């Protein structure tokens, strides 16, 4: 009865850090890292 079901995680998922697969972190990095351009496109916003 030590598993808290209120946090929304599945029962089999570990709640402490360091046990998730490395591929999960790698995919997140690839999603945000854009290699197509040498420099990012800066969009002018109001007030800058």
From Swiss-Prot:
HAMAP family: SspN. It is found in: Spore core. GO terms for biological process: asexual sporulation; sporulation resulting in formation of a cellular spore. It comes from the Bacteria. Coiled coil: none annotated. Induction: Expressed only in the forespore compartment of sporulating cells. Its main location: other. Belongs to the SspN family. The keyword Lipid metabolism does not apply. Keywords: Sporulation. One of its GO terms (cellular component) is endospore-forming forespore. Residues 1-48 are annotated as: Disordered. NCBIfam families: PRK09398.1. This is Small, acid-soluble spore protein N. Pfam families: SspN. Residues 27-37 have a biased composition (Basic and acidic residues).
């Amino acid at each position: 009865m030590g598993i808290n079901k209120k946090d929304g995680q599945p029962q089999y998922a570990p709640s402490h850090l360091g046990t998730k697969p490395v591929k999960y972190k790698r995919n997140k990095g690839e999603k945000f890292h854009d290699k197509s351009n040498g420099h990012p496109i800066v969009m002018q916003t109001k007030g800058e």
